[in-house]
Amino acid sequence: MISVLLTSAGTDSAVALCEALRAGFSTGLRLVGVDTRTAVACMPWLDHFARVPLRRSPGFMDEVVRLCEQHGITHVWPLSTEEQIIMALERATRLAGTVVIGSSADVVEVANDKVRLYDACAAGGLPLPAYQVVGDPASLHRAARDLGYPDRPVVLKAALGTGAAGLKIIRAGIPRLEMFHSRLNRDVTLEVAAAQLDGVSPWPSLMLTEYLPGEEFSVDVLRFRGAWKGGVVRRRDESLFGLATDATVVDRPDVLEQARRVADHVGVEFVSNIQFRGAEDGRPLLMEINPRVPGTIGLSVAAGSNLPAVALALAAGRDAVLAPPRIGTRIIRYFAGTVLPG
């Protein structure tokens, strides 16, 4: 029996992940989910759900360990980036009797920090957009000029932002009323971006990059014990807060090869997601890594590449091979939900 504890079971990826695991393991699989919420959308796919304390509270790991013992957990699969670090640090101590499905703590810390990630990839000779670290308003204005502003847009990124948090596309000449009415509050002028940061102390870790005008790609990748097992390239045609709302599986060997190079260089393990965007000359350049199961993993699974099931099989010591995806498979998201009985 494979018994898996899923932490942060209320994340965007949880339902698709549970569906993928159920499809890959018709028998011999027990899923236990935990979250700080009283209920989560993936509950119908779980054998048991438990509410746990906040991850930063002293009782969080105590409850995780108790549940592992109670349910005979063989594998712990953290679904949030923050909990990947926590579980990775505990894998040799309190979780020594289980397999943690995730990258090592040092790899997650690099992958989740865009400044450290870009510096590491630059040192490895991987193609990147031009970028500069900005540490105060003066360096923000200076970097913007160096990267071509106001003639070209530039992109301001929080080093530790996820889900498009801390992301600003800086363009010249945007009317103030247009920025006021913007739902996303993403496109701003340099003056507005600087004003939003005026007086902030301490200054957050920020970087400014060139704007990439090409197509955006999101690559689901699978590595196990340092070996590349395959990936699926998805073109992101529309997105909202970092989550693809219209995406298609495409045949782009060049993008897949770049994803392999980045994954191998950084050292992510199991299922991760690497995002690229095309430069003016069409080259796919790295945007970021999500060192966890992505929110749109269901598209790769629907296309025939069940990365989560293969990852779990490998973690359980079984032989498994990732099937190639069906090119052209597309997802168009709409709002739906899980109805729980009263």
Model-predicted segments: where are they?
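Residues that mark the start of a beta-strand
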Residues: 1-5, 153, 207
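ATP-binding N-terminal substructure of ATP-dependent carboxylate-amine bond-forming enzymes
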Residues: 1-103, 138
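Active-site nucleotide/adenylate-binding loops and adjacent lid/helix of ATP-dependent enzymes
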Residues: 108-205, 225
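Glycine-rich phosphate/pyrophosphate-binding beta-alpha loops
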Residues: 164, 236-248, 290-304
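Phosphate-binding site of ATP-dependent enzymes
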Residues: 180-260, 278-285
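Conserved metal-phosphate-binding beta-hairpin within the catalytic cores
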Residues: 231-233, 264-299
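Peripheral (often C-terminal) accessory segments that flank ATP-dependent C-N-forming ligase machineries
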Residues: 279, 309-342
